[in-house]
């Protein structure tokens, strides 16, 4: 981090006296030529503003604080605006003998009135006049506004009398808040002072309670608009939860209840202890630094810390890579830790005010701090009570027995009570009492496990514990991932937030609330014997991120350590550790491998070993994926997961001593026999086609789908036919192609889909013994919706296009907008290719990973085909900006690719295709902002 610079004096940056002298000289030089006067004045002011901003930028980049920078920018703007006012009223519209009605005061209001300003923020100005508008005042205001606009300012402005200001502020809390921070810049001092004095007496006095309620409601609505979680990985620094506006809200309320005090004085009104005051100032300074850097980096009032800006801001703020921790992730963790601190401060302060509803006028901030009498209802647990419908506590019981810190949250959960603000504050301040001895206390472990595995709402309760700092103190392994982010587009939340949401998903599955989305998981949950192990594994599943030896092994070590400290029996410890180590296995096998291949299921079954572990892994995997972020879980993933679960369950039903592959083959044979019998009854003409299809095909589709496929194959005959339909439960359109098999068929179909502007999210490829191919594609449009869902004709055209492509006819390419790289360009993605001859008995599995883009599947398939290989199946998976495509391939003789030279050539060709796309992305990026390596952690 750059060393902090000593504060500078404003006159060293913008000399107000010199600035006014220059303006006066320009006015005299161009006397009689108003346009020349104006041009000269604007040039002088523009230079002063530019110099001030550049000095502020340079100082910020060399270690100046965020608050100091914001105050310096505000000071520079003050000098420019007030100098313009003086120039306007002295040299342009001078009132030689001003009347009482021509008095005018210029005041900064809103955030600018607070004396802090980001580089490209709006400025809010209030022109205060004593009576109705005069021609002189109107001319001054109009001249100034046009000049400010020409200087590049975005100006919010109003011209009002004092009475108008007071009337409007009574009616509108936004205006009231704006005037609360009003600050005179220049003009009539008496007029400005009268507004401030009357505002406090006639508006503020006696209205503290309603102002508090309005600000808290406004805060909640703002959070809902910006994203309810403060741990969204692209936070809004100004408006987001845990951002600057939350700190401003605290200051507004305190200032309203204690008028006229500075920020520093407000912080010492016995609201916070010394540590919290220090945290408040540090958070405010950090957030202001981030915001100013954002503005300077983009040249616009950018408030969102988006992926494409995060590496650049990390660099500007002096963060570097440290070990396995990239600079961008270190910076963002710092951001989220401060956001968490802001949340705690907000809860200590704002929730206290919300709880203490008063009808009489507050006489100061003391009306809202602890000590006011409220009726208490003692609980059967000593030291705990219910007060105002919330759970209260006698703070001394934490010192007497720190286990009471955990009991506080268990009681709140059991009784469905929110914490009284005093109780939350006391718990947060006492979290340091949780020592190694408390972590090993058996009673403490029981209380904690009651919350986690048997609680009414474990996600909410654990989130409160996390906010208070109690959870990370009691489970240090979890504490290490608090506020940790992964620099990729796959995850929408920080690691701790994702984890707590995943715990909540398991609780919802257990309660049956997700039966529609996850029927198999809901049906499976009652069969799980050890729910405690499941919840523990979910809480600890990502604790290995950033650890030595890889995420899975490091996580298993952390899980063992945590479970041993909790005093669990050895078998449960090993089960939790196994689940953590293997929590990605089921999704990998379901999404990247051919579930109809007996080797896939056999290998997976060997890893899982038992039906209980299979059930645990299913629920764990579903919850993990669903909690990653909106839209990550979809019906297609659910279908693949169900197929793998069902096939593996069939293996276990075959008995412990049975061969897994043989058991699966028996399962497929039985399913195929039943399907063929049903199909023969429904359509006798389809019997030859069904007999020629491989057994594995029948486990992938329902009887109705098999019948539809058979009729499509009959329609195709020796040529080709295709049909499409919307599969809303899969969030995709399904297009089925029946055609005579030939080399490059899959490549031609994939390229035709790309040409039509569709994206492939899944594909199934089957070839009958009679030489007819049946390829099923699941496709979406560019917005991630089922292709053709808004235009059924588009889906019909796609089906016809694929039929043409299958017949070898040329395909017209639909015009497609150039890909907007946007945020994805910030990620430097290292391509990877892996060839595996052990994953299948009959095929070589080729797995290629690189930047996701339209046409990637077709490009990879073309490269494989050019190598003389046939694609038997394709499996498409994606993790944000990264795609992972797996292909089952054979050579011209129908065998695995065993020749080392050919394997290396294929790998090189695929890497070249992936690397070319990555290089093109880097070149196409529109800015020179810093990039960072994308995290591959899941």
UniProtKB/Swiss-Prot annotation:
Keywords: Hydrolase, Magnesium, Multifunctional enzyme, Nucleotidyltransferase, Repeat, Transferase. It comes from the Bacteria. Residues 1-379 are annotated as: Uridylyltransferase. Residues 734-813, 845-924 form the ACT domain. Residues 495-617 form the HD domain. Its EC number is 2.7.7.59, 3.1.4.-. It holds the Pfam family GlnD_UR_UTase. One of its GO terms (molecular function) is phosphoric diester hydrolase activity. InterPro entries: ACT-like_dom_sf, ACT_dom, HD/PDEase_dom, HD_domain, NT_sf, PII_UdlTrfase/GS_AdlTrfase, UTase/UR. Its cofactor is Mg(2+). It catalyses: [protein-PII]-L-tyrosine + UTP = [protein-PII]-uridylyl-L-tyrosine + diphosphate; [protein-PII]-uridylyl-L-tyrosine + H2O = [protein-PII]-L-tyrosine + UMP + H(+). Gene3D superfamilies: 3.30.70.260, Beta Polymerase, domain 2 (3.30.460.10), cca-adding enzyme, domain 2 (1.10.3090.10), Nucleotidyltransferases domain 2 (1.20.120.330). One of its GO terms (biological process) is regulation of nitrogen utilization. SUPFAM superfamilies: ACT-like, Nucleotidyltransferase, Nucleotidyltransferase substrate binding subunit/domain, Poly A polymerase C-terminal region-like. Residues 380-733 are annotated as: Uridylyl-removing. Uridylyltransferase (UTase) activity is inhibited by glutamine, while glutamine activates uridylyl-removing (UR) activity. Has four distinct domains: an N-terminal nucleotidyltransferase (NT) domain responsible for UTase activity, a central HD domain that encodes UR activity, and two C-terminal ACT domains that seem to have a role in glutamine sensing. Belongs to the GlnD family. Modifies, by uridylylation and deuridylylation, the PII regulatory proteins (GlnB and homologs), in response to the nitrogen status of the cell that GlnD senses through the glutamine level. Under low glutamine levels, catalyzes the conversion of the PII proteins and UTP to PII-UMP and PPi, while under higher glutamine levels, GlnD hydrolyzes PII-UMP to PII and UMP (deuridylylation). Thus, controls uridylylation state and activity of the PII proteins, and plays an important role in the regulation of nitrogen assimilation and metabolism. This is Bifunctional uridylyltransferase/uridylyl-removing enzyme.
């Amino acid at each position: 981090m750059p060393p902090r610079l000593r504060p500078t004096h404003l006159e060293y940056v913008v000399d107000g006296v010199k600035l006014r002298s220059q303006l006066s000289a320009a006015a005299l030089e161009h006397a009689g030529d108003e346009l020349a006067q104006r041009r000269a004045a604007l040039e002088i002011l523009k230079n002063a503003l530019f110099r001030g901003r550049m000095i502020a930028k340079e100082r910020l980049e060399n270690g100046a604080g965020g608050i100091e920078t914001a105050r310096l920018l505000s000071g520079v703007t003050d000098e420019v605006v007030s100098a313009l006012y003086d120039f306007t009223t002295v040299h342009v519209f001078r009132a030689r003998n001003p009347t009482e009605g021509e008095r005018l005061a210029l005041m900064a209001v809103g955030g600018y009135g607070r004396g802090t300003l980001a580089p490209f923020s709006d400025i809010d100005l209030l022109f205060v006049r004593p009576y109705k508008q005069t021609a002189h005042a109107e001319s001054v205001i109009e001249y100034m506004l046009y000049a400010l606009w020409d200087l590049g300012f975005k100006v919010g402005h109003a011209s009002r009398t004092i009475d108008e200001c007071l009337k409007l502020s009574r009616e509108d809390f936004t205006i009231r808040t704006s005037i609360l921070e009003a600050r005179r810049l220049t003009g009539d001092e008496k007029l400005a002072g009268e507004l401030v004095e009357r505002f406090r007496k006639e508006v503020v006095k006696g209205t503290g309670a309603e102002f508090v309620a309005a600000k808290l409601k406004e805060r909640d609505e703002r959070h809902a608009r910006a994203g309810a979680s403060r741990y969204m990985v692209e936070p809004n620094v100004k408006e987001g939860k845990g951002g600057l506006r939350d700190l401003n809200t605290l200051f507004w309320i305190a200032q309203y209840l204690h008028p006229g005090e500075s920020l520093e004085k407000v912080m010492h009104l016995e609201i916070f202890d010394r540590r919290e005051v220090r945290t408040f100032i540090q958070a405010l300074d950090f957030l202001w630094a981030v915001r100013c850097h954002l503005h300077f980096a983009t040249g616009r009032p950018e408030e969102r810390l988006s992926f494409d800006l995060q590496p650049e801001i990390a660099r500007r703020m002096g963060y570097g890579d440290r070990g396995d921790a990239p600079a961008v992730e270190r910076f963002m963790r710092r951001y989220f830790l401060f956001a968490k601190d802001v949340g705690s401060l907000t809860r200590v302060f704002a929730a206290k005010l919300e709880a203490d509803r008063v009808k009489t006028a507050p006489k100061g901030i003391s009306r809202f701090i602890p000590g006011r009498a409220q009726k208490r209802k003692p609980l059967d647990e000593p030291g705990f009570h219910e007060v105002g419908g919330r759970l209260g506590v006698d703070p001394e019981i934490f010192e007497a027995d720190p286990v009471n810190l955990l009991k506080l949250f268990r009681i709140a959960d059991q009784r469905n009570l929110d914490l009284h603000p005093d109780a939350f504050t006391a718990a947060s301040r006492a979290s340091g009492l949780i020592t190694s001895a408390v972590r090993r206390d058996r009673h403490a472990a029981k209380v904690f496990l009651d919350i986690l595995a048997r609680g009414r709402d474990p996600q909410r309760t654990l989130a409160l514990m996390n906010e208070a700092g109690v959870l990370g103190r009691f489970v240090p392994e979890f504490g290490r991932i608090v506020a940790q982010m992964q620099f990729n587009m796959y995850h929408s939340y920080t690691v701790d937030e994702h984890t707590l949401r995943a715990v909540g998903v398991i609780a919802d599955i257990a309660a049956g609330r997700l039966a529609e989305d996850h029927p198999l998981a809901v049906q499976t949950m009652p069969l799980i014997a050890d729910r405690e192990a499941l919840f523990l594994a979910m809480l600890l599943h990502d604790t290995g991120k950033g650890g030595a030896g890889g995420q899975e092994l490091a996580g298993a070590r952390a899980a063992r350590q945590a479970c041993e400290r909790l005093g669990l029996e050895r078998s449960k410890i090993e089960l939790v550790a196994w689940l953590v180590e293997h929590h990605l296995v089921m999704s990998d096998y379901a999404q990247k491998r051919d579930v109809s291949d007996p080797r896939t299921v056999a290998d997976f079954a060997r890893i899982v070993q038992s039906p209980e572990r299979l059930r645990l892994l299913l629920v764990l995997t579903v919850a993990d994926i669903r909690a990653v972020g909106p839209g990550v879980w979809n019906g297609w993933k659910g279908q693949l997961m169900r197929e793998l679960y069902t096939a593996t369950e069939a293996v276990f039903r075959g008995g412990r001593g049975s061969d897994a592959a043989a058991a699966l083959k028996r399962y497929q044979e039985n399913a195929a026999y039943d399907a063929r019998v049903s199909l023969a009854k429904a359509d006798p003409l389809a019997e030859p086609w069904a007999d020629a299809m491989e057994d594995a095909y029948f486990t992938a589709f329902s009887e109705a789908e098999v019948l539809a496929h058979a009729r499509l194959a009959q329609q195709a005959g020796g040529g080709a036919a295709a049909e499409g339909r919307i599969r809303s439960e899969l969030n995709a359109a399904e297009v089925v192609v029946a055609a005579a098999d030939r080399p490059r068929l899959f490549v031609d179909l994939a390229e035709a889909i790309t040409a039509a502007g569709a994206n492939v999210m899944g594909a199934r490829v089957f070839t009958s013994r009679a030489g007819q191919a049946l390829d099923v594609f699941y496709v979406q449009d560019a917005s991630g919706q089922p292709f053709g869902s808004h235009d059924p004709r588009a889906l019909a055209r796609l089906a016809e296009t694929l039929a043409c492509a299958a017949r070898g006819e040329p395909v017209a390419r639909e015009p497609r907008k150039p890909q907007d790289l946007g945020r994805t360009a910030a990620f430097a993605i290292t391509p990877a290719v892996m060839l595996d001859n052990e994953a299948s008995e009959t095929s070589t599995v080729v797995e290629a990973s690189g930047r996701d883009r339209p046409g990637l599947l077709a490009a990879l398939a073309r490269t494989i085909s050019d190598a003389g290989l046939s694609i038997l199946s394709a499996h498409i998976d994606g993790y944000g900006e990264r795609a992972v495509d797996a292909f089952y391939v054979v050579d011209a003789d129908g065998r695995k690719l065993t020749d080392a030279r050919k394997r290396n050539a294929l790998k090189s060709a695929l890497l070249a295709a992936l690397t070319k796309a990555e290089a093109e992305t880097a070149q196409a990026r529109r800015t020179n902002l810093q990039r960072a390596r994308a995290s591959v952690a899941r």
